[in-house]
Swiss-Prot record:
Family: Belongs to the heparin-binding growth factors family.
GO cellular component, one term: extracellular space
UniProt key word Secreted: yes
Gene Ontology MF annotations: fibroblast growth factor receptor binding; growth factor activity
Cited InterPro entries: Fibroblast_GF_fam, IL1/FGF
Subcellular location: Secreted
Gene3D superfamilies, per the entry: 2.80.10.50
Organism: Danio rerio
Originating gene: fgf16
Protein name: Fibroblast growth factor 16
Pfam families assigned: FGF (PF00167)
Deletion consequences: Fishes shown a severe reduction in the size of the pectoral fins.
């Protein structure tokens, strides 16, 4: 698996160039590289990647509005107040310094944001599934699209959950809003409900 680590390291420069691209489509070559990463992640089991600390992290994503982010098999994204919910257990894949992709473990889908700022679950790891993870002064993280921002102000689109748990369009978000502030929380196997605990012990 050292090959995978080396491969991820080789794409740092390309990924770091995302913010400067705005709405311009990424090159076919870069999308192809993301596809290769996706393929290698799908072939690998949890134990295969266990030693790659910092590349693959299993977490819940808690929003300051009181909800954990969930990715459902039908591609919808929503928030839940349930701790260790089935669709709220996520894998954070570190692609480069400060750049991550987030995948729902049970749904097998990647968190994506389209040009309208809408969140969705994607079967493929594409450029819309790469986010800039930034540690803020209040100890929370923000997750900004690396592709989409307001053309007039340059303000990025952020992942956000409203006060009712529904996803807010990234085009309607600002960095200082509490609905854009998240805490990645550790996953503890013993806290996962028994009904679906085995799903995560072997993934």
């Amino acid at each position: 698996m050292a090959e995978v680590a080396g491969f991820l390291g080789s794409i740092d420069l390309d990924l770091q160039a995302f913010p400067a691209l705005g709405n311009v489509p990424l090159s076919d070559g870069l999308n192809e590289r993301l596809g290769l990463i996706e393929g290698r992640l799908q072939r690998g089991s949890l134990t295969d990647f266990g030693h790659l600390k910092g590349i693959l992290r299993r977490r819940q994503l808690y929003c300051r509005t009181g909800f954990q982010l969930e990715i459902f098999p039908n591609g919808t994204v929503h928030g839940t107040r349930q701790d260790h919910s089935r669709f709220g257990i996520l894998e954070f894949i570190s692609l480069a310094v400060g750049l991550v992709s987030i995948r729902g473990v049970d749904a097998g889908l990647y968190l994506g944001m389209n040009e309208k700022g809408e969140l969705y679950g994607s079967k493929k790891l594409t450029a819309e599934c790469v986010f800039r993870e930034q540690f803020e002064e209040n100890w929370y993280n923000t997750y900004a699209s690396t592709l989409f921002k307001h053309a007039d102000t340059g303000r990025y689109y952020y992942v956000a959950l409203n006060k009712d748990g529904s996803p807010r369009e990234g085009s309607r978000t600002k960095k200082h809003q509490k609905l854009t502030h998240f805490l990645p929380r550790p996953v503890e196997i013993e806290k996962i409900p028994q009904a679906y605990r085995e799903l995560f012990q072997h993934r």
